[in-house]
């Protein structure tokens, strides 16, 4: 009876616990404690189909639990019960997709790695197989990041838990960080397996520890850019509840903007930035702008409504420059065509249209910029392309209301990894937070208090330096993966 209970515990509860640990670790200081343990559990059950699904399901369920905060949607015309069903369905739907993806990865593990032989397998062959499986996960996250179905995974979730290891992103990007983390998880699992079978594991432990030290040293090896105060930028964290924003009149926004511009000028700012969606559609200033401004808002184009960052010169009453949001939130901002007859989406403004996929923004009042509007912070590839094209600073504008602090922390993690990857300062500005400045090393220089209206100045550095990752992107990762596939085929064919 007890033995049966233990089997059920190992079969069902342990993989669930592993996924929960991973979800808790994502974008928190608990990473050091929970993520290695979570990945150890993943590897230990990786040949079990159900275990893989459960790990992935609970990882997403916990890490993306903020999706429940969509409820209540009564302000959009949904009934209370409909709102609850929609929110829970979205969360569980995403969790099921996560479970399926890890399940598919597990099939690859079963095909490539015979777990019963790992304690006796040649070290080189074992390393090749584990690296190949880890690369498969990392490349999978990269591919997903090019779709609107991805928010955060293992790669960016390492921050703030281990900033030294995250420093490797300058060379290998977020996808490479996935590879490193999964390899660490397997190393712990291999030590456990050797200990359980009473094999010598001292060399495995010491060699792995040495590699860990080297990786942390390389990740922490950087040449900080000397900070300056040459271009002070004012950030207006508006703290306007999204569920009430439809009631705000243009005159109210104008009055707020006049006040924000006066504060910015009193602090000697050269530029004022406001969060995503600050200005209503067809908004015009009823005064001449006193300062250069990048304001989140909406604009009508011939193809429909766009969410944009709108550029104002001194003296402008309407925007003279813009960059449109390209990546739209599924259901929230863009719904499939066949659903248009049922809903305008889970958004106050209804469906909007995507702009150009380029995140490079050049105007004559600053050095070239890389712009990420909300969800676009997940797409490291396009931000990297903007930096490669000459952007000297990243600006990340968002509206994360009404979501909880958990989402704020994940947005911060994403923004910090983008800074590390490209060695660029990152100005973040959000409605209810987070807002502030992140250094090129991924360190937080200034962070406003959340859920309060604030107007303060940050002093970003513009930099023309480019990292290895900025220059080459994921190409080395794909080439190494192909090389590992070749080696795995070679050893499979010519060795026992």
Swiss-Prot record:
Gene3D superfamilies: Carbon-nitrogen hydrolase. It is found in: Cell inner membrane. The keyword Transmembrane applies. Residues 236-464 form the CN hydrolase domain. GO terms for biological process: lipoprotein biosynthetic process. GO terms for cellular component: plasma membrane. Pathway: Protein modification; lipoprotein biosynthesis (N-acyl transfer). The chain crosses the membrane at residues 23-43, 50-70, 84-104, 126-146, 171-191, 205-225, 476-496. Its EC number is 2.3.1.269. The keyword NADP does not apply. Keywords: Acyltransferase, Cell inner membrane, Cell membrane, Membrane, Transferase, Transmembrane, Transmembrane helix. This is Apolipoprotein N-acyltransferase. It comes from Prochlorococcus marinus subsp. pastoris (strain CCMP1986 / NIES-2087 / MED4). The gene is lnt.
